[in-house]
Curated annotation (Swiss-Prot):
GO terms for biological process: negative regulation of translation; translation. This is Large ribosomal subunit protein uL13. This protein is one of the early assembly proteins of the 50S ribosomal subunit, although it is not seen to bind rRNA by itself. It is important during the early stages of 50S assembly. It holds the Pfam family Ribosomal_L13. GO terms for molecular function: mRNA binding; structural constituent of ribosome. Keywords: Ribonucleoprotein, Ribosomal protein. Belongs to the universal ribosomal protein uL13 family. Part of the 50S ribosomal subunit. One of its GO terms (cellular component) is cytosolic large ribosomal subunit. NCBIfam families: rplM_bact (TIGR01066). PANTHER family: LARGE RIBOSOMAL SUBUNIT PROTEIN UL13M, RIBOSOMAL PROTEIN L13. Disulfide bonds: none annotated. It comes from Bifidobacterium longum subsp. infantis (strain ATCC 15697 / DSM 20088 / JCM 1222 / NCTC 11817 / S12).
Length: 149
């Protein structure tokens, strides 16, 4: 059996918008990663760039379960003394986009295509986004956090 390779005409990049209000971080990240890779399409091929554009709004209202508020997110600049440690509680106030981008990045494959797919992810703190001319489809995540209820 031959490997299926989608034609360039089949490689359309649709736009989706996801509301992150009271959605658990891991559930949001897995759904976003599936959409970014294009696994929701019948023409999916792991080696082809068939992913979609994903817009996540209300990033500051995301739900973190367990003890993640005390957990830290590390990054290093590569320079001496360049280690940066931020707790999730600090990041939720200052930069909630970084929490979501890092979670989605961890769920994408570790290859060259992952950078292209991650560039199609756009995360916004509030409910407004500048991508209304693209007419994104609303993508509902069924399960919201039990803590929010």
């Amino acid at each position: 059996m031959k490997t299926f390779t989608p034609k360039p005409a089949d490689l359309t990049h649709d736009w989706y918008v996801i509301d992150a209000t009271d959605v658990v971080l891991g559930r949001l990240a897995t759904q976003a990663a599936v959409l970014l890779r294009g696994k929701n399409k019948p023409t999916y091929a792991p080696h082809a760039d068939s992913g979609n554009h994903v817009i996540i709004i209300n990033a500051d209202k995301i739900a973190l379960t367990g003890n993640k508020m005390g957990k830290e997110l590390y990054s290093h600049s590569g320079r001496p003394g360049g280690l940066r440690r931020d707790s999730y509680a600090e990041l939720l106030e200052k930069n909630p986009e970084r929490i979501i981008k890092n979670a989605v990045k961890g769920m994408l494959p570790k290859n060259r295509l992952a950078k292209v797919q991650l560039d199609r992810l756009r995360v916004f703190r509030g409910a407004e986004h500048p991508h209304t001319p693209q007419k994104p489809q609303v993508f509902e995540i069924a399960q919201v956090s039990q803590q929010a209820k």
